[in-house]
């Protein structure tokens, strides 16, 4: 059995701002609440290889792994995968962005499978990722909408 999640949120902000803020990997610790640090290991055109390190969990364990992301600004999609898979057999993520009358819809689709010796199974991880994705997406929405509001205010003041 494999796990699959599909979550989306509408952000009341222009596509360009949402795209730029969510693809500025070095600033992810300020966008997501779960990441303590990001280290970019390499760049090749639209492909970025980086190490993510989370804040310690309730047991004090710090999780860290290497991922790759390939951003396509034309189709407004990002494809990512874990290079260091940890407890996963594989983990693939697709980020999709779409403009709507209300702003920008950001969608995360994750497909994965846990290793047989992982401490949790696919069903547990699916629930965990769904819960965490909703939390992180709401936080990202709030931070981007705040930045959009600050830009509107600065633009009005400059006029």
Swiss-Prot record:
It holds the Pfam family Polyketide_cyc. InterPro entries: COQ10_START, START-like_dom_sf. To polyketide cyclases. Involved in developmentally regulated synthesis of a compound biosynthetically related to polyketide antibiotics which is essential for spore color in Streptomyces coelicolor. This is Putative polyketide cyclase.
């Amino acid at each position: 059995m494999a796990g699959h999640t599909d979550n989306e949120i509408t952000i009341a902000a222009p596509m360009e701002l949402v795209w730029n803020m969510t693809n500025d990997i070095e600033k992810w610790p300020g966008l997501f609440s779960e990441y303590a640090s990001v280290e970019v290991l390499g760049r090749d055109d639209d492909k970025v290889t980086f190490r993510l390190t989370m804040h310690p969990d309730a047991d004090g364990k710090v999780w860290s792994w290497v991922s790759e992301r390939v951003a396509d600004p034309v189709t407004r999609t990002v494809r990512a995968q874990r290079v260091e898979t940890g407890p996963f057999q594989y983990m693939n993520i697709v980020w999709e962005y779409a403009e709507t009358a209300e702003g920008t819809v950001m969608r995360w689709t994750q497909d994965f499978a846990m290793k047989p010796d992982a401490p949790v199974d696919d069903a547990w991880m699916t629930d965990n990722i769904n819960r965490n994705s909703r939390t992180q997406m709401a936080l990202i929405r709030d931070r981007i909408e705040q930045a959009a509001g600050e830009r509107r205010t600065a633009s009005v003041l400059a006029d």
